[in-house]
C-alpha cells in the first residue's frame, strides 16, 4: 500500500492516508490506515497538520470514497513534506 493525499475544493484542507504498521505484534502487519488531517495556508509552505487517527482499512476506504463524492481531489503537491 502507498501513501496518498486528498485536498478539498477550496485548497484549504488536506488529508493524508498512509498504511499503519502495528509493531507491537510479533510479526508486524498492515491492517489499518493512519489518516492525518490539516490546513493549508499557502501553497508554497508545508501544511499545518492538526492531528491524526488510526482507522480500519474498510473505514478508511469508506471515508476516501465520501471525500471524493464531496469534490476532494487526489494530489501529490505536498508529498515531499510527509
Language-model-detected regions and their locations in the chain:
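Terminus-proximal functional modules
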Residues: 1-70, 75-82
Amino acid at each position: 500500500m502507498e501513501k496518498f493525499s486528498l485536498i478539498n475544493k477550496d485548497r484549504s484542507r488536506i488529508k493524508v492516508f498512509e498504511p499503519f504498521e502495528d509493531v507491537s505484534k510479533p510479526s508486524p502487519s498492515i491492517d489499518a490506515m493512519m489518516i492525518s488531517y490539516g490546513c493549508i495556508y499557502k501553497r508554497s509552505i508545508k501544511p499545518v497538520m492538526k492531528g491524526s487517527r488510526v482507522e480500519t482499512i474498510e473505514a478508511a476506504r469508506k471515508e476516501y470514497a465520501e471525500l471524493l463524492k464531496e469534490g476532494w481531489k487526489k494530489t501529490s503537491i505536498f508529498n515531499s513534506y510527509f
